[in-house]
Curated annotation (Swiss-Prot):
Function: Catalyzes the formation of 6,7-dimethyl-8-ribityllumazine by condensation of 5-amino-6-(D-ribitylamino)uracil with 3,4-dihydroxy-2-butanone 4-phosphate. This is the penultimate step in the biosynthesis of riboflavin. Is able to use the non-natural R enantiomer of 3,4-dihydroxy-2-butanone 4-phosphate as a substrate, but with less efficiency than the natural S enantiomer. Cannot use unphosphorylated 3,4-dihydroxy-2-butanone, 3,4-dihydroxy-2-butanone 3-phosphate or diacetyl as substrates.
Pfam family, one: DMRL_synthase
Record protein name field: 6,7-dimethyl-8-ribityllumazine synthase
CDD domains linked to this entry: Lumazine_synthase-I
Iron as UniProt keyword: no
GO cellular component: cytoplasm; cytosol; riboflavin synthase complex
Biological-process GO terms, alphabetical: riboflavin biosynthetic process
GO MF term (any one): 6,7-dimethyl-8-ribityllumazine synthase activity
Organism: Bacillus subtilis (strain 168)
Gene3D superfamilies for this protein: Lumazine/riboflavin synthase
Reactions accelerated catalytically: (2S)-2-hydroxy-3-oxobutyl phosphate + 5-amino-6-(D-ribitylamino)uracil = 6,7-dimethyl-8-(1-D-ribityl)lumazine + phosphate + 2 H2O + H(+)
pH-activity dependence text: Optimum pH is 6.5-8.0.
Amino acid sequence: MNIIQGNLVGTGLKIGIVVGRFNDFITSKLLSGAEDALLRHGVDTNDIDVAWVPGAFEIPFAAKKMAETKKYDAIITLGTVIRGATTHYDYVCNEAAKGIAQAANTTGVPVIFGIVTTENIEQAIERAGTKAGNKGVDCAVSAIEMANLNRSFE
């Protein structure tokens, strides 16, 4: 049996990051965590491009556009959606998730889902570097692994 898996060596990888500006008090921390993890794993700072979009709903569009350029080995998406009093939360979360999956599946470039979806602000803060770690770090590590896995199929 052959086992195929990606490694966590970021040297030589080009990574795109799409960040939603809405709730930027959280998304900026996710971005910092992702950038730090990429650098610690050997990705050169000049090989990281960051695109800011208004919010989580717009992330799939920019992620797909970045992936279509074929300049990137992986795309990381970072956003925060916090439940409010209306059903808006459900629509944004569902469509963002579908769009991110579609971007990966139609382009052949790994697109990592890094949209933090929470019931309240406290949960979002916990996932941006306090009790629950930093989801930006997790996404960066996943991007490196998936980029290297994808390369092994070429």
